[in-house]
Regions:
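Structured catalytic core of nucleotide-sugar glycosyltransferases
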Residues: 1-87
Length: 87
């Protein structure tokens, strides 16, 4: 019997309404066993709503922290929720 690991893909996003939905769909298509976290880095468009509508977990940051800040927020989420692997 194999041990199943909890895997999370972290996707930082800032004003990506034009692409975030497709990216989340692609991850779910190719890696159906993983969860997707979109870190909405203070976007002013529909990034958050579109990511959520495609099945992603969305972490909304109140303002733009940049790629480093968004990734740190994602890693903190991984740690707090107890995921085994993050991508």
């Amino acid at each position: 019997m194999g041990y199943e690991k909890n895997i999370l893909v972290i996707i930082p996003a800032y004003n990506e309404e034009g692409s975030v939905g497709k990216v989340v769909e692609e991850v779910h298509t190719h890696l159906p066993q993983v969860e997707v976290l979109v870190v909405n880095d203070g976007s002013t468009d529909l990034t958050s709503a579109l990511a959520q509508s495609k099945g992603a977990i969305v972490l909304d940051l109140p303002f733009n922290l940049g790629i480093g800040g968004a990734m740190q927020a994602g890693y903190k989420y991984v740690y707090e929720k107890g995921y085994d692997i993050r991508i």
